[in-house]
Regions:
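Hydrophobic alpha-helical segments, chiefly the membrane-spanning helices
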Residues: 245, 252-255
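PLP-dependent amino-acid enzyme catalytic core
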Residues: 1-243, 247-248
Length: 255
């Protein structure tokens, strides 16, 4: 398989500071340094041979793009990755390196939204399969394998699982698995206060699109959460927490 089982690491300093046992799921040790590989690969692994032969397309400026690129290379499937023209060259080079000759990178638009719309256009024009970064059942299920590993690696009762939220794919996948095997375990979403589209949507009981989002955590800076992820989050999340930029910087410095 492309994605690997990652370590569940005991965080001694955090545990001592908080007076609780804190474990970290080290998804930064994936080949693309992110959990995004799980969802991208799972989506592509469920495509028919005919669909794989036609190829896939994705829009991303970061980790999802690398996940699709590496999966395409391993599965020998052509992939088109649409990235904003503002994407740093190091990220573009990383996608090309992961995918090699199997990947075509197209730079389009000033923002992720522009790149996404162009990818949707090319999907129809070329007959490709769109690999959504979060709002897709197979992508969500792929991210959910993280929770499966956690419960296999740790045999004691788990009080709560804290999950970062962007578009909602990660918390949806983890939340569905957790609630199926351990209903008493809390699933707590964590968002930046300046990009908390899911938090606002859940409070309003409808999807809320933000005009602007903060970019300190650019991987979770999503203006509008997915339809499917919103539906699932309403069922599985226990609560949400938002953090200010100053608090996030302070925590990073202490870690």
């Amino acid at each position: 398989d492309v994605a690997r089982e990652t370590e569940l690491q005991f965080a001694s300093e955090l545990s001592n500071r908080l007076g609780n046992q804190v474990l970290l799921k080290r998804e930064d040790n994936q080949p693309v340094f992110s959990f995004k590989l799980r969802g991208a690969y799972n989506k592509m692994a469920h495509l028919s041979p005919e669909a794989l032969k036609r190829g896939v397309i994705a829009a991303s400026a970061g980790n999802h793009a690398q996940g699709v690129a590496l999966s395409a290379s391993k599965m020998k499937c052509k992939a088109v990755i649409v990235m904003p023209i503002t994407t740093p060259s190091v990220k573009i080079d990383a996608v090309k390196a992961r995918g090699g000759s199997w990947v075509e990178v197209i730079l389009h638009g000033e923002s992720y939204s522009d790149a996404f719309k162009h990818a949707e256009f090319l999907e129809k024009k070329r007959g490709l399969t769109f690999v959504h970064p979060f709002d897709d059942p197979d992508v969500i299920a792929g991210q959910g394998t993280i929770a499966q590993e956690i419960f296999q690696q740790y045999q004691e009762p788990i009080d709560a699982v804290f999950v970062a939220i962007g578009g909602g794919g990660l918390i949806s996948g983890i939340g569905e698995y957790v609630k199926a095997v351990s209903p008493k375990t809390k699933v707590i979403g964590v968002q930046a206060s300046d990009s908390d589209a899911m938090n606002r949507s859940l409070k309003a009981n409808k999807r809320i699109e933000m005009k602007d989002v903060g970019l300190f955590s650019d991987g979770t800076a999503v203006k509008l959460v997915g339809k499917e992820t919103f539906r699932i989050c309403k069922k599985v999340r226990s609560e949400e927490h938002t953090s200010e930029l100053q608090s996030r910087l302070h925590l990073v410095c202490r870690l």
